Amino acid sequence: MNSTLDSSPAPGLTISPTMDLVTWIYFSVTFLAMATCVGGMAGNSLVIWLLSCNGMQRSPFCVYVLNLAVADFLFLFCMASMLSLETGPLLIVNISAKIYEGMRRIKYFAYTAGLSLLTAISTQRCLSVLFPIWYKCHRPRHLSSVVSGALWALAFLMNFLASFFCVQFWHPNKHQCFKVDIVFNSLILGIFMPVMILTSTILFIRVRKNSLMQRRRPRRLYVVILTSILVFLTCSLPLGINWFLLYWVDVKRDVRLLYSCVSRFSSSLSSSANPVIYFLVGSQKSHRLQESLGAVLGRALRDEPEPEGRETPSTCTNDGV
């Protein structure tokens, strides 16, 4: 994470008069990113409320969705706070810089947690498709909760080490920071991303094959998973590249600034997209304006095949959270 210290603007940044076009693009993209963050926080807050406070029964996948919504909300909140500090008036620069650095570290924590949760979702569903009998009979009862807790702990540990060795306010150790940075980025780009891509590809092939053989639509749950992963890889991957590659590549400040802006907007879009995916996939054309949001969300996350010509029940089944 050492590479991220210089990859984005910070409070007190001054842009020279010769960068008028870059400045205009920067503020335009920043405005879009902030608007996306606000909408995404509202959507993820709704998902969190429906799954935790609305009395909805939760399946193992619902547990992952709840944790993912929390990670996305935290990421969007930190992103919006950072953008506000960059573009708003700075009354006390030192305090603003410390708040900015804190928000940035929490943002990395949320990003890592969200990435690892999506990887766990894809891996678990891939195993359920490849080994359905083993998965049904031998999966630990509280696997989803245990895995989610372990991934949050791993994300916290990784970002704590990065903060301890790399944050400028804590007298960073450049040598140790470099090692932590390599391990951190290797874990993200060398393990989580490849596993997510591999398992989601296998899942897509098997789901597509089964749908063609049985001549029926794939489960809504699989559509939700594959769409969410596709959006994440398309929109959030630029942020990971921004963290890792820009440190090794010598590029102009204008290019670095613009790429940082675009990667922020795309990652904000990714964290805001999941609630939209849930409600689009879970809605039924004949009752699109008549159903409650809880019913739509429950149908999207239901881990059962949908009978042909019949409406699918809308509650998440509680099969061992």
Curated annotation (Swiss-Prot):
Source organism per UniProt: Mus musculus (Mouse)
Protein's recorded name: Mas-related G-protein coupled receptor member D
Main localisation: membrane
Residue spans of biased composition, Polar residues class: 312-321
Family that this chain belongs to: Belongs to the G-protein coupled receptor 1 family. Mas subfamily.
Residues bearing attached sugar chains per UniProt: 2
Composition bias, Basic and acidic residues: 302-311
GO CC annotation terms, alphabetical: plasma membrane
Transmembrane regions listed in the UniProt entry: 9-29, 31-51, 73-93, 147-167, 182-202, 221-241, 261-281
Stretches of the chain found on the membrane's Extracellular side: 1-8, 52-72, 168-181, 242-260
Membrane topology category: Multi-pass membrane protein
Pfam family for this entry, one: 7tm_1
SUPFAM superfamilies, per database record: Family A G protein-coupled receptor-like
GO biological process: adenylate cyclase-activating G protein-coupled receptor signaling pathway; angiotensin-mediated vasodilation involved in regulation of systemic arterial blood pressure
Cytoplasmic side: 30, 94-146, 203-220, 282-321
Taxonomic lineage of the native organism: Eukaryota, Metazoa, Chordata, Craniata, Vertebrata
